[in-house]
Amino acid sequence: ADAATAGVRKLVRLAIEKNIRLSLMPYPKHVLHYEAERRCEGIEARWNELWKIAAVVEQEARGKAGPVEVWDFHGYRDANAERVHAGKAMRERWWQDNGHFNHEVGAAAFDSIFSAGRAYGHRVDTRNFDGLVEAVERERSDFLARNPWVEPELYELARLVGAGW
């Protein structure tokens, strides 16, 4: 096992042993960030990483309901898809740029984890994993078809990065 998986396993074991509620989640990102990653690195590594985390949690829980959950806030819905440079003041935005969210995104994630409302994100386990991947890929296709601004903003971002922005 790689060092990252070993670290997650150690953390999960400790949470189970001490009966501490632990919610694991990859950092939420803006759709422009997801699209840049997808085009540069592919999407397989991201899904493989999430699968490994869900599998470790289930292995360590040994079939019992435990205090450890895996959540994913990847997606192409409103919370991750606000146009970053749409002329809004920072205090009115969910995103500072394509890699840094404001407190509204964090609050939406916490609301999904700690309340009954699940408007944002998905709880992940190995049983629902394939369905989650299919749903996100379908969501992506639909989103990109409805939002032609993504392509030019992605190219502008690449131009800025290439120019040493």
Predicted regions: what they are:
Residues A1-G66:
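Conserved, well-ordered alpha-helix/loop/beta-strand core segments that scaffold catalytic motifs
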Residues W51-W165:
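C-terminal regions of proteins
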